[in-house]
Structures are given as structure tokens and as C-alpha cells.
Curated annotation (Swiss-Prot):
Source organism of this protein record: Vibrio campbellii (strain ATCC BAA-1116)
Keywords, ordered alphabetically: Ribonucleoprotein, Ribosomal protein
Domain of life, source organism: Bacteria
Protein's UniProt name: Large ribosomal subunit protein bL28
GO terms for biological process, alphabetical: translation
Amino acid sequence: MSRVCQVTGKRPVTGNNRSHARNATKRRFLPNLQTHRFWVESEKRFVKLRLSAKGMRIIDKKGIDTVLADMRARGENV
């Protein structure tokens, strides 16, 4: 499974580690992904999503039904 948030689309980005001497070595910044089950009352079932902490906050704000409708409009299979 890829390291991509299903709600926000956040994915790993690359950058540099910087030592005290300012030497640069490549590294990846990974999103804070969590797997979470949400109860969808309209469908009477649980939906399991892999999402970032920001994605959870979006669901808290908009509601799971609205977020799922947006995801389905993008063509995501949930």
C-alpha cells in the first residue's frame, strides 16, 4: 500500500538532512498516516481509510459522508 493520504493526497517528499557542518544527505519526509475505521451511518457499514492527521481533521470538520462523496467524485474506490 502506498504512503498516500486518501483524503488529502499527501505523499512523501524529498529533502536533505543537514549536519552541523551543513553537509547534505538525501532523505524522505513521510506523511503522518494512520489507518482508521469510520462508521458511515448512511451505508450502515464501516469504511477503513488510510489518512493523515490532517485528513482526520477534515473528516471531523466536514463529516464522513461529504468526504466520501468528494473521494468518489475523484474516482477513488471506497
